[in-house]
Every structure is written in C-alpha cells, then in structure tokens.
Amino acid sequence: CTYLTNSGVCHLHTDPKRWPKMFDGADFFKRLLNAPVPRIAIENPIMHGYAKKLIGGVQQDQLIQPYMFGHMEQKATCLWLKNLPNLTPTNVVKDEMMLLPKNKRERLHYLPPSPDRWKLRSTTYQGIADAMASQWVNKLLESAA
C-alpha cells in the first residue's frame, strides 16, 4: 500500500525512486485481484489515480471506516472482494466519534514522524478483523453446507 495509497502520491514527485516501486506494487495488486482462486479479499487504503489506472480502473467493492466497527476513529479502508459479501457494520459509533476533536478522531493523520509511524498507520482494527472473521467464515460455512 505504501506506493499505491492516495496519501503517498505526493512523494512520487519528490522521490523518483518511488515510481518503479509503485509500478511493481500495482502489478502485484492486479495479479492478486485476478488470481484464479474462488475467494479474494484485498484491503488497501484509498488509491491514487496513477495506481487506479494501472490496476485497470477496478473500483473497490466497499469502503469501510473503523467507526463502523466500534472504534472512535476515521481511516478509510477499501475492500476488493470476490465471492465474499460486503461487511455489515457491527457497532457504529460515528455520532459519538464526531463529538471528538478532529485531531483525536483522525489521530492517524496527525501522527508525528517516528520510526513506528508506518506501523501505527497500518494497524488493523480488532472490530474490523472480528467482522471479517465472523461474517466471512459464516458465508463459507453456509456455502459448504
């Protein structure tokens, strides 16, 4: 996601070494998207226009937010799905979250530079992971029956 995400597009123009990495990342993403397997779930932040074009303009199937799954934060995450249903929100806390100051609800956007910043920004929220596990496993069990 480092080279495909909308938040990183500005770095393409300041560091020319990122362009080949972006091409490689888009190629890898496209190969995953078109893999000959029965089910696919790819999670990635919102893509920039160059990456979207390189993967063939395929739009995500769903855009989710942590606040849809019980976390008082905003961080858009896209899902590309094959033979899996869109996730159903499990605990929407958007109204409560919107009462927080912007720098709290968009905490990840305001993180200062640090060695761990990338790791903090790429955290998978437990509520989202739980929804994926329970909802998609149930779908698989239903189709196996």
For each predicted feature, which ranges?
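Conserved active-site and SAM-binding loop architecture
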Residues: C1-A145
